[in-house]
Amino acid sequence: MSNYAVYSDDGGITWHTSKTPACTNGDEAKVVELSNGNVLMSIRNRAKGYRLFSKSTDGGDTWSEPKLNTTLLDPACNGDIIAYTHGGKNYLLHSLPASPTTRENVTVYISSDNGETWQAKRRIFNGYSAYSSLQVLEDGTIGIIVEEGKWDGGLPGEDGFNLGYYRFSLKWLLEGDPVEPVAESAE
């Protein structure tokens, strides 16, 4: 299975496929345009352990060899990555389960250098959890939807999932504000 980028430069009138794959051992990739115009692809690593990243310097036409980022754990699970600008500073936010082997403890990581390093992280959900999706809200806070496993003593996840919705601020993420993210029921 390979990760190619399919993209449009004219609002969806025409579409292009990258000439080279970003990765041949991953799937469920997410892309984000960096503050310098390059494109970063975050790739689910089917081998588990750590997240894979590939970069394009030509708008998604060709991709670098994928590299493991040993800061971002990846239990072979989908995650999300978004660009976020606040106070004149550019950030990347990435949500993933914080385990190399088990889908649990969905956490948000933050980078201020276009994904080269990931300095801060805060856990959103404690326990069995998997896919997540991030969104910058109109008021500048960040919303996240998380698959939260229900567990009644069997194998994690076999009892199904609830969707949890949380909202948090950049301050909470960066400074460790003791206020937990605001949960809004999405059940």
Question: Which role does the model predict for each range below?
Answer:
Residues 1-187:
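Asp-box/BNR beta-propeller blade signature and adjacent active/binding-site loops
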